[in-house]
Amino acid sequence: MTVFALGGCTGAKNTFEIEDPRGLVSSATLRLCGSETPLAREADRLTLTRSIACEGDGEIRLVYEDGGSRHCIIGYVTPDAKQDWHFRADQSSCHHFT
């Protein structure tokens, strides 16, 4: 019982991932719940894993090496639900895939 109670307090971990196989993106920032959190680069991907403490929607703002920007739209999120968001960046847009 105690393990369940402690596990319930931590919240589900959600993954936000941008595939950047061509190295076009210089940075990516998750905007969600009134805050901004940068994604970390790992080879050809930018990733972030965190719990979500709000209901609503958000976006990941991509800043490209050439100074341009794009927005990856995050759909509706809810606290304590495991949700993973995967996108692929190209020169003109951000594509969501599962």
Question: Can you say where each PLM-predicted feature lies in the sequence?
Answer:
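Asparagine-centered strand-capping/turn motif at beta-strand->loop junctions
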Residues: N14-L24
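Extracellular beta-sheet/turn segments enriched in Thr/Pro/Gly and aliphatic residues
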Residues: R70-T98
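Short beta-strand segments within Ig-like beta-sandwich modules, predominantly Fibronectin type-III
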Residues: T37-A43
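Sec-dependent bacterial lipoprotein signal peptides
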Residues: M1-G7
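Exposed aromatic-hydrophobic patches
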Residues: L46-S51
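Bacterial signal peptide processing site
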Residues: G8-A12
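Short, ordered, surface-exposed loop/turn motifs in non-cytosolic proteins
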Residues: G23-G34
